């Protein structure tokens, strides 16, 4: 069954506003809400960066049904994975069956400012090794009573998570390339990526790598949630749909451009040098509900079963109402 969620854009809005929109999303029939976890936003001016774990607790208390998770959190530098396991154990105990931990290898923007990672920013090999070790430790803490762990990066001695749900928290692994996607298939409860990067990336690299990982662990596609953040700027006003994407210009920077940038002022400067055409190409920009559905359909046809819609505009209430009335019924029919 296709699931449709809403992305709570923590880099753009404050915590109270995001909670209120989450309540509205649940009322309108969305299945999930995922929040980003940034220490610093993509933009210095008008940016926000609420603490995701506190926010999830508040959102959980204001909602009843919707699944809540991170997309994504880095449990390896500014957080100790044992503390992340404790926090998500508490969230899972408060909201049984509704909490997901989405994780990634991290960005300099969020880790260097607090001294959690050195300069230069660690290369991918170390970041990926930390991620795998963190997942192993967190899962042991969620399932075992006394955990002594001696890893390359993290250690515990007779550690116990006393408040946790009956079932371990699902771990969704975000990947932008086949190596981590393969790991997601082998070890993840879910796989996360973002839209707008060319069909070949998903069809020829990411999803085949997930399938390879599944095969190596004797699992099938039914054993993993295949989630994609859909970058959708939908508005009944075509001009507004195009204008709204400008705030999110940093997403159109290449990985090479963003690598090692730890200052939101510098990130904003780089993003503002991009043309409107460069910014818009990452997004589905439309005022036509049918076109929105058809553009999104390509990801469903590729095998994604969980769509989390990220809308760029500053009026999220307007988007939620228009999208749920105009586009969501068509997606439910896919």
From Swiss-Prot:
Q: Give EC number(s), comma-separated.
A: 1.1.98.2
Task: Give the GO biological process terms.
Answer: carbohydrate metabolic process
Q: What are the binding positions for coenzyme F420-(gamma-Glu)n in this chain? A: 37, 74, 105-106, 110, 176-177, 179-180
Kindly list the positions annotated as binding substrate: 194, 197, 258, 282
Q: Where along the chain is the active site annotated?
A: 38, 107
**Record keywords, A-Z:** Carbohydrate metabolism, Oxidoreductase
Matches recorded under Pfam families:
Bac_luciferase
Please list the reactions this protein catalyses: oxidized coenzyme F420-(gamma-L-Glu)(n) + D-glucose 6-phosphate + H(+) = 6-phospho-D-glucono-1,5-lactone + reduced coenzyme F420-(gamma-L-Glu)(n)
A Gene Ontology MF term for this entry? glucose-6-phosphate dehydrogenase (coenzyme F420) activity
Q: Which InterPro entries match?
A: F420-dep_G6P_DH, F420-G6PD/mer, F420_G6P_DH-rel, Luciferase-like_dom, Luciferase-like_sf
HAMAP family assigned to the protein according to its UniProt record, in alphabetical order: F420_G6P_DH
What family is this protein classified in? Belongs to the F420-dependent glucose-6-phosphate dehydrogenase family.
Oligomeric state and partners?
Answer: Homodimer.
**Role noted for this protein:** Catalyzes the coenzyme F420-dependent oxidation of glucose 6-phosphate (G6P) to 6-phosphogluconolactone.
Q: PANTHER family, per this entry?
A: 5,10-METHYLENETETRAHYDROMETHANOPTERIN REDUCTASE, PTHR43244
Tell me the NCBIfam families matching this sequence.
Answer: F420_G6P_DH, F420_G6P_family
Q: What is this protein called?
A: F420-dependent glucose-6-phosphate dehydrogenase
> What is the source species?
Intrasporangium calvum (strain ATCC 23552 / DSM 43043 / JCM 3097 / NBRC 12989 / NCIMB 10167 / NRRL B-3866 / 7 KIP)
